[in-house]
Amino acid sequence: MREKTPKQIVDLLDKYIVGQNEAKKSVAIALYNRYRRTQLPEDVQKDITPKNILMAGPTGVGKTEIARRLADIVDAPFVKVEATKFTEVGYVGRDVESMVRDLANEAVRIVEKEEFVKVESQAIRQANKTLVRLLVPGVKRNNRQNQMQQMQEMMQSLLAGGGMPEETEEVTDEIRNQRLSVAEKLDRGLLENEEVTIEVEQAPKANPMGDMMGQMGMDMSSMLGDMLPKKKVKRTLPVGQARKLLVQEEEKKLVNYDDIYQKAMDRAGQSGIIFIDEIDKITAADKRNSAGVSREGVQRDILPIVEGSTVSTKYGPLSTDHILFIAAGAFAESKPSDLIPELQGRFPIRVELNALTKDDFVRILKDPQNSLLKQYIALLKADGVDLVFTAEAVDKIAEIAFEVNQGTDNIGARRLATILEKLLEEVLYEGPDMEMGQITITQAYVEQKLSDIVKNKDLTKFIL
């Protein structure tokens, strides 16, 4: 399947993000260049590195939203991290290499999902066979082997990677006929609500040492593999739910995880994308730096990752040479030139996002696929209430949002969510008790609910 063209990517972003065409174009071109590179000879491919992007603009204008929507659009491993979460090597906290390990985990998840689809029909057949055996159990054999022989068989099975040996059972002609009947009913979907008891692997508990081991590229559970028996728990579920769990277990048995890890590492290295948000908060000029922790040190730690280096992950080494990095920040109290020169040079494409106007707010309220107004209309529809906004009301909401942003801190489109929540507070509260019908939000209603608050600057600061 051919990759999406830059125009197609921009069209998809337009469904959710108003304006900021320059940023959309830059991101779309950078993404499509990944595809162009794959069409070249290998000796040329290795010399073409991604052109990393630095997006600067006020808060609430769409930087993070572009990243969020990109994750849905691109068929590539994508992770979003915040620069403020990282600490310099030597301090307690996440090291910068963890973003690459997160990308490796995401790549494995994507490839694993693709491989599961390939074996799904086989896994379903196997799960149905298991369900038939559980619904019509056989007669347990009275095994008279001595304990030493049982222990030997168990150890041989564990060393061979087969887990604990299953108990043998005897199937009589009567049981065989019953199983054929149950199998037919299963195929016709007649037993979906019947309860069945199954054994499933217990989800691993969070290990406080796990993250530390992960940072060193080690994973003890992977290293031990199948040497230790998997802990299983019994669960009684309807057949439909039980089948889903059994299919998942069968899929894991049918796929080759060595191949999955190899494909995932290749995909993460060749087409992975890392979005670094809040990069302006780690500049030396930012006033919010905590004393003692050098933000410049974090920049210097990020530098080799962006330049291209090899990071150890639990799936193997991952090279960052061809990973695309997109950094974003408001740069309200600093500017891109406050980043260390070496890091600036690694983000050759600079994009400035514009502050939002009143007209932008009107479009944000109405145009996107799941705009704020459409969300509230859908929420009240659940109570049987039809919520309608007049054009004048929408215009007034946008005007108030713009005025409040100008008069207090400018938080961009996020101001709309605060204003709408305050505006519709009473409607949302009374909604379940209202008779089914239509509620129309007019300009007069908006002014009645919000004008007094907007005029009082002290109230505005605390409420809107």
Swiss-Prot record:
It holds the Pfam family ClpB_D2-small. One of its GO terms (cellular component) is HslUV protease complex. GO terms for biological process: protein unfolding; proteolysis involved in protein catabolic process. SMART domains: AAA (SM00382), ClpB_D2-small (SM01086). ATP binds at V18, G60, V61, G62, K63, T64, E65, D277, E342, R414. It is found in: Cytoplasm. Keywords: ATP-binding, Chaperone, Cytoplasm, Nucleotide-binding. GO terms for molecular function: ATP binding; ATP hydrolysis activity; peptidase activity; proteasome-activating activity. The keyword DNA-binding does not apply. A double ring-shaped homohexamer of HslV is capped on each side by a ring-shaped HslU homohexamer. The assembly of the HslU/HslV complex is dependent on binding of ATP. Belongs to the ClpX chaperone family. HslU subfamily. ATPase subunit of a proteasome-like degradation complex; this subunit has chaperone activity. The binding of ATP and its subsequent hydrolysis by HslU are essential for unfolding of protein substrates subsequently hydrolyzed by HslV. HslU recognizes the N-terminal part of its protein substrates and unfolds these before they are guided to HslV for hydrolysis. NCBIfam families: hslU (TIGR00390), PRK05201.1 (NF003544). This is ATP-dependent protease ATPase subunit HslU. It comes from Lactobacillus delbrueckii subsp. bulgaricus (strain ATCC 11842 / DSM 20081 / BCRC 10696 / JCM 1002 / NBRC 13953 / NCIMB 11778 / NCTC 12712 / WDCM 00102 / Lb 14). The gene is hslU.
